[in-house]
Regions:
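Preference for intrinsically disordered or flexible, low-complexity segments
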Residues: 1-327
Length: 327
C-alpha cells in the first residue's frame, strides 16, 4: 500500500507559542499522485466518475467570462458538442443538452471521495460518495468577487447506481489549467494549526516579531501553520485574508469543506511539507526550489491559487459555496 508521510517539523512551534497547542486540528492531506488508474468508484482526481447512466451529465448554462473572439467560438463549440453527444444521446436520451444553444459546455469531474477513504469530510446520512465537478472555463461573479471555474457538488449512495455512464462528455472548449490529470489519492492524517491571519491580533504580532529575530533562523510561521495542498480540515491554508461566506439559506457562517489546490508545496514550504517518500528530484532541479511532484493533478487556479469549498450542515440539502484565492 502506498503512503505519504509529512516530515517531522524542523522546530516545535508550540514550544515557542504555547497558545497554539489547543488550536491544533486534524487535517487530511489528500496527496494526489499520477501513475495508477483508479476505477469509477474510487477516490481520485479526474477520470471516469461513478455517474448514473440515467442522470443527465451537467452542462454549463452560466455565461462565461471571455473576450469577443471567444464569444464567436460558441457556435463552433455547440457544433462540436453536438457531434460528441450524438452517439451518447442515442443510448442516454435523458442526458441531452438543452436546445437552442443554452448550455455552453460540459462539466468535468474534478474530485471524487469515498467515505471509506476520508470519513473526515463528513457525509450526509445515507451517502458514501462525494463528487466535485466544474465547468473548465472562467466565470465572473462580481457579486462575490469570484473569477474561475463554476463548481457543483454531488452527494451519492454508490450502491444505488446500477449502471455507470461510461462515455462521459468532454467539453469542446476549455481552459487547460482547469482540466485535471487522473490521480489516485494517498490520504495522510496530520495535525496542523490556524493560518496566522486567523489568530488573535496580539499573537500575530508576537509571531511576526519572532520571525525577524536571529532565533528564527529563516523560519516563518506561514510554513508550519495550515497544511497546503488538496486537503480536508478546519484550519484553512489561506492565500489572502480569511473569509467564510454566509450560507445562502440561513445567512450563518459556513464551514470549510475542502481545498482544491494548484500546488502541494512550493520552493519555500517544501522542507515542511514534501513527503518523505517522494522520489529524488528529477532533471537536476535544485532541492531549494522544491518544484517536482507538487502539482500532479495538473490544475492551476489563477496564479497558483486555491479554490475553497464551504458547506452549511445546518440547512437542508447542505448548501455549498466556494471562492478562489491566489497571490
Amino acid at each position: 500500500m502506498q503512503k505519504r508521510t509529512t516530515p517531522p517539523p524542523p522546530l516545535d512551534i508550540t514550544a515557542l507559542f504555547p497558545e497554539l497547542a489547543p488550536l491544533a486540528r486534524r487535517a487530511v492531506r489528500l496527496h494526489p499522485r499520477r501513475g495508477l488508474k483508479p476505477g469509477p468508484g474510487e477516490s481520485k482526481v479526474g477520470g471516469t466518475f461513478l455517474w448514473p447512466a440515467n442522470e443527465p451529465w451537467p452542462m454549463c448554462s452560466v455565461g462565461h467570462a471571455q473576450t469577443e473572439p471567444r464569444r464567436k467560438q460558441d457556435a463552433e463549440l455547440l457544433r462540436r458538442e453536438a457531434e460528441t453527444w450524438g452517439p451518447v444521446n442515442e443510448r442516454y436520451p435523458s442526458g441531452k443538452p438543452m436546445p437552442e444553444g443554452q448550455p455552453h459546455g460540459a462539466y468535468v469531474g474534478v474530485i471524487q471521495l469515498r467515505v471509506a477513504d476520508v470519513p473526515e469530510l463528513g457525509f450526509p446520512e445515507g451517502c458514501d460518495l462525494f463528487q466535485l465537478l466544474w465547468c473548465p472555463r472562467d466565470h465572473d461573479h462580481e457579486e462575490y468577487s469570484y473569477y474561475g471555474p463554476e463548481c457543483r457538488v454531488y452527494w451519492r449512495q454508490s450502491s444505488t447506481i446500477s449502471e455507470v455512464l461510461k462515455e462521459q462528455p468532454v467539453p469542446a472548449i476549455f481552459d487547460p489549467h482547469y482540466m485535471p490529470q487522473v490521480c489516485q489519492f494517498i490520504p495522510e492524517r496530520i495535525q496542523d494549526y490556524p493560518d496566522v491571519f486567523a489568530l488573535p491580533e496580539e499573537l500575530q504580532y508576537r509571531i511576526w516579531n519572532w520571525e525577524e529575530t536571529e532565533a528564527a533562523q529563516g523560519h516563518v510561521y506561514g510554513y508550519p501553520d495550515a497544511a497546503p495542498g488538496m486537503k480536508i480540515g478546519e484550519n484553512v491554508d489561506w492565500i489572502q485574508d480569511p473569509w467564510f461566506p454566509p450560507c445562502p439559506s440561513c445567512r450563518q457562517e459556513m464551514e470549510h469543506l475542502l481545498t482544491v489546490a494548484s500546488w502541494e508545496w512550493d520552493g519555500g514550504s517544501f522542507r515542511w511539507w514534501r513527503p518523505l517518500e517522494e522520489p529524488p528530484l528529477a532533471h537536476g532541479v535544485p532541492l531549494q526550489d522544491g518544484q517536482d511532484t507538487n502539482d500532479d493533478a495538473g490544475i492551476t487556479l489563477g496564479d497558483a491559487g486555491n479554490i475553497y469549498l464551504f458547506v452549511c450542515r445546518r440547512c437542508p440539502g447542505w448548501p455549498i459555496a466556494y471562492t478562489l484565492q491566489c497571490s
